């Protein structure tokens, strides 16, 4: 086995969550790696894992990997710089087995941003004009990044709607989340499944097996993002063994 990859319990480290609940899952994963002894270990998690109280958890992870014979590097990567039409920041743990004497890996991605207007689907899920969401959407202005911004600005500072991001034609789309709404700024509606699939870099013929497209994509790492990391692991590490 050349490498082992995991996306540890993301819900434990949601961005914006005040209290980070630490899980033993990552350490269970490391215990398995200790038995399998792969050349390379790759783990992925949300940005929140390197923020606040979770920093101590990260240090414990690095220490445990060191104890089982691995040197670990941590990278905060943005999918938008990796050929993915989405501003999705994720933390990657890359660990190499010490006995292989591999040099540290360097990850630097600077691909051209892909804006929503470059692939926008003409179809979308129309809003019900009788809903509060539609009435609030009508009050949007260019500087609003989410429905929450619109609500706060027009409803005396009320804090609501911040999980409903606007998708603007001249911007790289926000992170696809498993919940909330992804609202089009240009027309009164939410993103089509085709758009969500494109933004997540999934193939258009992907079989979601009846599950919500937004939920599946929101819980996944963009395949193209993973491919870019894997490519560098091959070039900088595996090809040198």
Q: Residues of each region from the PLM?
A:
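Conserved active-site and SAM-binding loop architecture
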Residues: 1-241
């Amino acid at each position: 086995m050349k490498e082992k990859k995991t996306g540890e319990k993301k819900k434990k480290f949601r961005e914006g969550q005040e209290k980070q609940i630490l899980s033993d899952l990552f350490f269970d994963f490391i215990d398995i790696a200790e038995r399998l002894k792969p050349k390379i270990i790759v783990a992925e998690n949300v940005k929140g894992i390197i923020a606040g109280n979770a920093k101590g958890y990260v240090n414990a992870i690095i220490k445990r990997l060191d104890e089982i014979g691995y040197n670990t590097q941590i990278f905060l990567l943005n999918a938008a710089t990796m050929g993915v039409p989405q501003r999705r920041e994720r933390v990657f743990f890359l660990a190499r087995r010490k006995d292989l004497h591999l040099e540290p890996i360097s990850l630097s991605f600077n691909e051209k941003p892909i804006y929503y207007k470059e692939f926008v689907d003409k179809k979308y899920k129309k809003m019900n004009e009788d809903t509060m969401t539609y009435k609030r959407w009508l009050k949007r202005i260019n500087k609003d990044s989410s429905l929450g911004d619109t609500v706060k600005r027009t409803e005396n500072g009320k804090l609501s709607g911040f999980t409903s991001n606007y998708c603007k034609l001249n911007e790289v789309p926000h992170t696809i989340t498993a919940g909330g709404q992804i609202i089009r700024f240009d027309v009164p509606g939410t993103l089509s499944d085709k758009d969500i699939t494109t933004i997540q870099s999934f193939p258009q013929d992907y079989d979601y097996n009846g599950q919500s497209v937004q939920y599946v994509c929101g819980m996944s790492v963009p395949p193209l993002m993973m491919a870019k990391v894997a490519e560098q692991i091959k070039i900088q590490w595996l090809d040198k063994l």
